[in-house]
């Protein structure tokens, strides 16, 4: 009888404890508890699984104009290759660096131009003066894309702790789970550019700038283990420069033209889907700043395919084209 009373008393005590927690009487969770809860919203990842199934793509780029170039034709590529639901968003500031992104995050600054295109209507829309938090939570983004500024990408001393700070902010601020995070490895400027940093930092040497971009990624991005994929945009572009395309893939000696954007777009698509490019089905391409459509010949498509596939296989070095200058 005494044992029965003790058991009943114990059960009543446990019930009281659970009631207290449910009514808010529990202590405030620690920071580690909060972090663990936030991380729990992220799905368990298979490192070998594709980030995109080829049908649905929802990607947000936090970027500069070079990220705009990389993603400008991604929508067109995805739709041409059979996707049915596509949303591409970009939070963009011209020349934006990692340091600037972190400052904007800390100040919740309405500093970005936000552009977005959706398969719902296939039209780019632009909103000015948007914050990182607003863009991150505008859609249930599956993939977050970011990079260093173009002039700083090949300068490891500009990275600081900004990558970690930015990624921490993104994960704490975004309210929906993310399938993957991707880092864009940028291309070198055209050999004859007059951009000051190209000459003062990289000695006016395209291959040196390309190699320094890769070195910075190896030293400052790979060891962090914060990104599910690295996008070898720079290697794909450099591969294509060894073909009969030559050093003609920019519109102004540093921003990509429409042909360069096709190469970058297919590189990103291949990385996200995990698929080798076996066809280049995109039609005539144009952009908001380059409205004259470019029609790819059959041989052009082979060069695009070759440049991308070789970059995926060998992202850290240039693979000479089988279609050299004629």
What are these regions (language model features)?
Residues 18-39:
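Sec-dependent signal peptide cleavage junction
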Residues 11-19:
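Bacterial N-terminal signal peptides
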Residues 129-254, 258:
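Alpha-helical cap/lid subdomain in secreted, periplasmic
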Residues 69-159:
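Conserved SGNH/GDSL esterase-like catalytic core that processes O-acyl groups on lipids
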Residues 1-11:
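Bacterial N-terminal signal peptides that target proteins for export
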Residues 42-82, 304, 314-316, 320-325:
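N-terminal module-boundary/linker segments of secreted carbohydrate-active enzymes
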Residues 255, 259, 265-326:
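Conserved catalytic region of serine esterases and O-acyltransferases that act on ester linkages
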